[in-house]
Each structure stands twice: as C-alpha cells, then as structure tokens.
C-alpha cells in the first residue's frame, strides 16, 4: 500500500466512524460544556494535538486549553502540580516513569471500569506501551492511562554523506567494509570516528551527537540507551530490587565506558549539557553525521529544508557486543487527574482520542499512535520514511524505573553518569557502584527490603 492509499484509507476510516464518535460524545450538551485543560510538554507533537483536538471541541461542545512546559522543566513543574493536588490540569500526558507514583499516591484515576464500560481494550495497543505507560504495578491489568504517544530513542544519519562515493571509498579502505547503517555499537563508533573532523558541504563536521544533559533526565536516557545493549540490568530478574552485580556488572561497566568514549571522540564542541533540542539543532545545521534522539523529532527532519527528504535516514539502536539489542522507551499515556473537578468531561476526551479514526489522523499529523490498528496496517511501514524504524525500535524497548521514588532515582543516575561521562571524574565502575548504592538506599527508605 503506497502513501496515497494509506491517506485514502485513513479518510475512509474517519468517515465510517464519524457518526459513532459523535454519538459517543453526544451526551455532553451545550449546557454541560466544560473548559478542560490538558497538560503536556512543549514540543512539536503538542502542536499537532492542538490541531487534532479541534475535532473533539466541535463534537463535544467542550473547550480545550493547553498547558505545555519545556522538557527540561516538565517533570519539576508537573510533578509539583500532582504532588500539591493542584487543579490546573484535568488531563495529563505524563511521562512513562511517573505512573507508579501517580497511581500509588492517588494522583491519577484508575481507568479499568471506564475502559470496560466503553469498549476500550488495552489489547488494541502496542504491548510495550501498555506496560510502559498504563500499568501499575507493571505486568498487571491495572490501568492508569491510555497510551497516547509512542516514542523511543533511535538514530538519524546523513544518508547523503554516507552515499558520497569518496566517503564510501575512504571508509572501505580504512575499515574493510562498506559505509552503511551500523548494526552494532562498535560499527557506529567506527563511523563516528570516520566523520569526526571530516569536511562535508564545505565545513568541518563531527561524528555523533549523544545526550549529556544534567538537570532533568537527558544523560540517563542516553546512557541507558547504550547500557541496555551491553548487558545492564536494573535488578536481579529473580529478586526484585537486588541490584549488586546487575547495575554494576562488568558488562554494564563496559557500556558506560563506551558511552564516554563516544562522547570523548566524536561529539561536537559545546555539547556538555545537551538534550533533545540541541540534538535537533546540531543535525539540522549539518554539524553531525549521526544523531541520537527520540523518534518524535523525525517528522521535523523529514520536512526540513536543509536535511529533509533523501538527505536523512533513520535506524534503530544497534546491538551490543553480545548481540543484545534494546532501546530506551520514551512516550507517554494520557490520564485523568484525580484532583480535577471535571473528571467526567475529561473522560470523554480519552474516549474520543481512543477512536481508530482519530488515532489514524494523529499519526498523519505527526503524532506517534500506539494503536495496533494504525501501526499494523499494511500501509503503515511505508507511510513515512521513518515508520519502519519506529516499528523496529518499539519492538526492542526498555524503560527506566517507574517507582514512586522515580525522581530520586533519576537524580542519582543523572549525577553519577554526568560526573563520569562529561566531567571525567572517577571510573565507570566507581560510577555504577555509587549508583547502585544510592538506589539501594532509596529503596531501603521505601521499605523494599
């Protein structure tokens, strides 16, 4: 199915479902109309959601307001809002790692009964997003959100630079293989070193952009994206919260050493505290051959006047030294805030958003739908140049702790990773030993032992 067929199918799906959607929302009369506020991060998908939500407003009579906060302060602002019982947000598209705290502290309403009453099945969504965004405790049928935006860390690369005949010849002469999308992290580093300092498009370029940001979650998302494939585990699979020899295993140490080596060898200058936005800027300005970033950035690259179209390619996280291949989960679910006085109206938004035709339009506008009916459609993989990479990446995801103590756990990893990778303090083993000790202390305070 080509893109035109995909677009036509989405239009037909929308038409066939329109009356059902209107009926589902029809119980909200003009006299009952509410002003609802949805809280999320300030990024391109949020703008797409504003556009998408116009249809909900027209059908429901409710008016949507939006509170969008930059990613670097999103967690602080919104977790404070939840912890204080604030009434700013009726709907929250909260980060995946917040689900444990929001559930256990009564900050989101449980959605099981609502889903059952309205025929919304979690089996209809990508399994990794249900576990990652909706379930608490994990791997139990207790749902606190509807998967709203599937996301994952992957890579973009300068397809045009890779294809340039002189680059192909020089790379093969040096490494004995074709210059192609890396299948392993070792291959990725070779490519990064090859491009480091090379001249492309008339200027000096750099090998690879990776996350280093200290203040929120940046370097943790980047380092974990690599450590998973090297053999890092959060704890003993047979003994929860038993971290010694798993967080700080020899394989995990090798992964953190690799991440630092990639930063030291091949990052652009001035990237010692950089996250998503800096990566976008570095790639669009032609500074780097490869760039680590969440999939939400890919539509913007595809349409960019400088790097769009055939100039940019996409690939999933490569494999580690033993063949393990994982990627850091991103993305969020949409929840109803327990402190809201407009819960019934907020639930009508979730019901509307869950409709297959709305999810198809969400993808078309630049949102990453987690609905199987969208992503498993035969036309999906070819509907955008990055669609197949998104599917491949979502099949290998892992995520950070989603415990109620998430913020404290994240602060520890941010400190230890940044101090070692960027500041060059101590060794990788010392960093992971320190991290394991900090995490153990946090869980001891929670009574996990």
PLM region spans:
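Extracytoplasmic "Venus flytrap"/periplasmic binding protein-like
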Residues: 35, 51-128, 132, 165, ...
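Extracytoplasmic "Venus flytrap"
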Residues: 36-51, 69-72, 151-152, 217, ...
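Mature extracytoplasmic/periplasmic domains
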Residues: 55, 279-280, 295-304, 320, ...
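Conserved C-terminal helix/tail region of periplasmic/extracytoplasmic solute-binding proteins
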Residues: 63, 392-449
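Hinge/lid segment of periplasmic solute-binding proteins
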Residues: 96-154, 219-222, 311-315, 379-385, ...
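Extracytoplasmic/periplasmic solute-binding protein
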Residues: 135-149, 153, 184-244, 288
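Extracytoplasmic/periplasmic substrate-recognition and gating elements
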Residues: 137, 141, 160-161, 243, ...
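Glycine-centered hinge/linker elements that transmit conformational signals in sensory
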Residues: 187-196, 230-273, 317, 436
């Amino acid at each position: 199915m080509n893109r035109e067929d995909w677009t036509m199918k989405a239009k037909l799906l929308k038409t066939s479902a329109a009356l059902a959607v209107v009926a589902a929302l029809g119980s909200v009369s003009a006299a009952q109309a509410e002003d609802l506020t949805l809280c999320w991060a300030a990024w391109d998908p949020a703008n797409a959601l504003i556009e998408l939500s116009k249809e909900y407003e027209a059908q429901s009579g409710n008016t949507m307001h939006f509170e969008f906060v930059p990613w670097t302060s999103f967690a602080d602002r919104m977790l404070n809002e939840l912890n204080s019982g604030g009434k700013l947000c009726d709907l929250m598209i909260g980060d995946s790692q917040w689900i444990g705290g929001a559930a256990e502290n009564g900050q989101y309403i449980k959605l099981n009964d609502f889903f059952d009453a309205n025929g919304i099945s979690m089996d209809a969504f990508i399994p990794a997003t249900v576990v990652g965004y909706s379930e608490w405790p994990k791997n139990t049928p207790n749902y606190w959100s509807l998967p709203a935006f599937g996301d994952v860390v992957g890579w973009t690369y300068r397809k045009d630079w890779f294809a340039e005949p002189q680059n192909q010849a020089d790379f093969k002469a040096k490494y004995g293989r074709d210059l192609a999308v890396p299948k392993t992290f070792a291959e990725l580093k070779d490519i990064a070193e090859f491009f480091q300092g090379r001249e492309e498009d008339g200027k000096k370029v750099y090998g690879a952009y990776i996350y280093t940001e200290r203040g929120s979650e940046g370097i943790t998302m980047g380092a974990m994206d690599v450590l998973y494939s090297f053999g890092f585990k959060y704890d003993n699979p047979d003994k929860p919260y038993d971290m010694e020899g798993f967080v700080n295993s020899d394989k995990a140490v090798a992964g953190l050493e690799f991440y630092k080596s990639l930063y030291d060898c091949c990052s652009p200058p001035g990237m010692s505290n950089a996250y998503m936005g800096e990566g976008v800027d570095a790639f669009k300005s032609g500074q780097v051959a490869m760039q680590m970033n969440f999939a939400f950035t890919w539509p913007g690259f595809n349409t960019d006047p400088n790097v769009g179209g055939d100039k940019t390619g996409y690939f999933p996280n490569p494999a580690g030294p033993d063949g393990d291949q994982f990627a850091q989960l991103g993305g969020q679910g949409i929840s109803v805030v327990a402190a809201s006085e407009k819960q019934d109206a907020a639930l009508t938004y979730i019901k509307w958003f869950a409709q297959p035709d709305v999810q198809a339009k969400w993808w078309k506008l630049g949102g990453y739908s987690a609905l199987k009916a969208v992503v498993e459609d035969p036309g999906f993989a070819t509907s955008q140049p990055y669609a197949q990479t998104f599917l491949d990446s979502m099949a290998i995801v892992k995520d950070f702790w989603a415990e109620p103590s998430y913020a404290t756990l994240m602060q520890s990893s941010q400190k230890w990773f940044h101090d070692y990778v960027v500041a060059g303090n101590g060794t990788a083993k010392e960093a992971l030993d320190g991290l394991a000790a900090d995490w153990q202390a946090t869980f001891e305070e929670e009574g996990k032992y």
